[in-house]
Amino acid sequence: MNSIDPRAIIDPSAKLADGVEVGPWSIVGPDVEIGEGTVIGPHVVLKGPTRIGKHNRIYQFSSIGEDTPDLKYKGEPTRLVIGDHNVIREGVTIHRGTVQDRAETTLGDHNLIMAYAHIGHDSVIGNHCILVNNTALAGHVHVGDWAILSGFTLVHQYCHIGAHAFSGMGTAIGKDVPAFVTVFGSPAEARSMNFEGMRRRGFSDEVIHALRRSYKIVYRQGLTVEEAVKELDELAGKHPEVDLFRQSIVNSARGITR
């Protein structure tokens, strides 16, 4: 059974599964779907086409699924897709996609999006990510699983943040960040790898040692990117985690943060 505050506005075309809660003065617009057990707080605006999965919680003053401010956007049908078990805190803004890219913005599962963060059009956020307060992603940004972006991190459009990467507070990211790499500063510079995150997630000492060696190859031996990638081949063949690091470098379109 749903719990809809009488002061909320629900469009007749919106689809709400069982167990959905909607707080006072929230607006659920046309072509919005909300999955089972999701809780929408007060003063939330949901605009479609937007699909929200199960057991999410969205806090007050968030604007979810609004049109992109991209000047190329002319009202074409685009959408936002949000997975399951996400927490979206106060004042978060997430825009739908554009037809010039995927026509979709995607947020995966088990993410924590903290207060006043922004996720721009056509961005893709993986699973188990944390975007700390006031983090802002421009359009077309990709964030890999388990990445953590500290408060006031800014990410340039089209940048890719690799899985398990970490940014320090106030970091300005203008190039791709390889998987596992920790970056700080404005502009961002690579400082180390997210070894603390690896330990918390149960990575073995052997894997952590291999990743430490891999980081030194790329960042400490004075090699070109092409030379470093070749040097990583042997370790990547032994450890999938090193291969993930290597592939995030190989697939970089903007160049990697160094």
Swiss-Prot record:
Presence of the UniProt keyword Iron in the record: no
Entry keyword annotation includes Kinase: no
Subcellular location: Cytoplasm
Gene3D superfamilies to which the protein is assigned, alphabetical: Hexapeptide repeat proteins (2.160.10.10), Udp N-acetylglucosamine O-acyltransferase, C-terminal domain (1.20.1180.10)
Pfam families, per the entry: Acetyltransf_11, Hexapep
Organism domain of life: Bacteria
Pathway: Glycolipid biosynthesis; lipid IV(A) biosynthesis; lipid IV(A) from (3R)-3-hydroxytetradecanoyl-[acyl-carrier-protein] and UDP-N-acetyl-alpha-D-glucosamine: step 1/6
GO BP terms: lipid A biosynthetic process
An example Gene Ontology molecular-function term: acyl-[acyl-carrier-protein]-UDP-N-acetylglucosamine O-acyltransferase activity
Enzyme nomenclature, EC number: 2.3.1.129
Keyword tags: Acyltransferase, Cytoplasm, Lipid A biosynthesis, Lipid biosynthesis, Lipid metabolism, Repeat, Transferase
SUPFAM superfamilies linked: Trimeric LpxA-like enzymes (SSF51161)
Enzyme superclass (EC): transferase
Predominant cellular place of this UniProt entry's protein: cytoplasm
Function: Involved in the biosynthesis of lipid A, a phosphorylated glycolipid that anchors the lipopolysaccharide to the outer membrane of the cell.
HAMAP family in UniProt: LpxA
Assembly and oligomerization: Homotrimer.
Stated name of the protein: Acyl-[acyl-carrier-protein]--UDP-N-acetylglucosamine O-acyltransferase
